Amino acid sequence: IGAAAYAKASGDKEAANKARFVFGKCIEYATTPGLLQPKFTNTRPSKGIGVPMIMMNTAQQLRETIGDPRCEEWITKWIAEIETNFVKDDIKCVMEQVAPDGSIIDHIDGRTLNPGHAMEGAWFILHEAKHRNNDKHLIELGCRMLDYMWERGWDKEHGGILYFRDVY
């Protein structure tokens, strides 16, 4: 993101090329099983919302600063991953970690919610909705995520957003 912003500000084509190269490497690491060291053991395999969420925002930043033909396709894929695997409408929740198939892991690793992190993801999706001419589906998805996690994350006793909550 920094190299792309610098490239836009300075007109430095080498910095733009470096930003695109690093973005490609990030895509490779994010999508090639086994390339990254897993956060958890194979006892309870899982995946987190962090990678698709941050990669979506990175692609948005590259698209807005220097452009990259891969961005639109990858942003769409990462939004679908978040919606399909992490947004749980039946319990009005956005999960931080899920099993590889998107199911909830009934263990501390899978039950821990991070409301602020999910709200950040909602913000990125709403930003994308604006970019896509106020895409109704993305507005609805982002608002749903925000509503779910605001309700779960607001500290009714002291105010503010709680860092972590149990899903149940």
Model-derived features with residue positions:
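Glycan-recognition and catalytic cores of secretory/periplasmic carbohydrate-active enzymes
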Residues: I1-Y168
